[in-house]
Regions:
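C-terminal or mid-to-C-terminal helical accessory/interaction module adjacent to the motor/catalytic core
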Residues: 177-178, 182-222, 227
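Common nucleic-acid-contacting/processivity interface regions adjacent to the catalytic cores
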Residues: 210-266
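Generic, well-ordered alpha-helical scaffold segments in large soluble proteins
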Residues: 99, 103, 111-112, 120-124, ...
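Short helix/loop capping segments that flank catalytic or ligand/cofactor-binding pockets
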Residues: 38-40, 118-119, 167-169, 186-191, ...
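Conserved DEDDh/DEDDy metal-dependent 3′-5′ exonuclease domain
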Residues: 71-184
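Conserved RNase H-like, two-metal-ion catalytic cores of nucleic-acid enzymes
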Residues: 3-9, 13-107, 128
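Short, flexible loop/turn elements at secondary-structure junctions
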Residues: 33-37, 51, 64, 114-117, ...
């Protein structure tokens, strides 16, 4: 028992019978961030909420910089989404956190959330502890970010779809467990192609390849679409392979916390 995490000991005591833990039907936020590689400023934040009618994108641009309040438009491209434009990075961040408070999702999912998106938010948000419903977020390692199976946000789960298969977490792990063999790599585009999905936006209308360093400046509308599509494609992938149901079912079957599901073996 000394080797069993305390949280798991509590859960096993509360729910001693197999499958006695209540079923978990989480509200999930699939999200993606873009930021300026030179200044580190967040530029676009896309959210696909499983309880919402359509995705929402928070953004600001050189053109919107300094504007008062928010400008909201419904964009018909890429299946339709709501775009909320702000006058600065800080105002966009505040609106994102307000929306997080309002929606109160159970799980945040992003491709490389552990070493990219979440550490970036910790760096850039004025109040990063607002990511937690109880105001407590463990800070990442300065250089390496979080472990791929970490749960640093108290009261809210994260799942990193880009985690290595060897961690027992992420899409690659589930891909292997389902008998599909090994993925060529863990890139979102590769996984989308394996599932016959359209995948990411990779070029403009003239065939010029995406340049994440410049598109915020030169192709703003397309850059916002690019961030949005990364989010909606990730949701499609996860729903096609039952990503979230797999881990919530393992959690209930074994009667443990989500952080322990990656340790479960056949």
């Amino acid at each position: 028992e000394a080797d069993v995490p305390y949280e798991d000991q509590v859960l096993l005591h509360m729910f001693p019978e197999r499958l006695s833990m209540p079923e978990f039907h989480p509200r999930v936020w699939y999200f993606d961030l873009e930021w300026d590689v030179n200044t580190d400023a967040t530029t676009v934040m896309a959210v696909d909420d499983t309880h919402a009618e359509h995705p929402v994108v928070f953004a600001w641009s050189q053109e919107s910089e300094g504007q008062n309040g928010v400008t909201i438009d419904f964009i018909d491209r890429e299946g339709g989404y709501e775009r909320r434009m702000y006058g600065s990075e800080g105002e966009m961040h505040d609106a994102f956190l307000d929306h997080l408070d309002e929606c109160d999702p159970d799980i945040l999912i992003a491709h490389a959330i552990a070493w990219a998106d979440l550490p970036h938010l910790i760096r850039r948000l004025t109040e990063p502890d607002r990511l937690s419903p109880v105001g407590n977020v463990i800070r990442p390692h300065v250089k390496n970010g979080y472990k791929e199976t970490a749960q640093p946000i108290t009261g809210r789960l994260i799942l990193d779809t880009a985690a290595k298969g060897s961690t027992g977490s992420g899409i690659e792990s589930l891909w292997i467990k389902s008998g599909r063999g090994n993925l060529p790599n863990r890139k979102l585009q590769t996984i989308a192609e394996e599932l016959k999905l359209s995948g990411k936006i990779q070029q403009d209308e003239d065939g010029n390849k995406l340049d994440v360093r410049t598109w915020w400046y030169t192709h703003f509308d397309l850059f916002v679409d690019y961030c949005l599509v990364d989010t909606t494609e990730l949701r499609k992938i996860c729903e096609m392979i039952n990503f979230v149901p797999f881990f919530t079912t393992v959690q209930r079957f074994c009667g443990v916390q989500m952080k322990s599901t990656h340790r479960v073996t056949n």
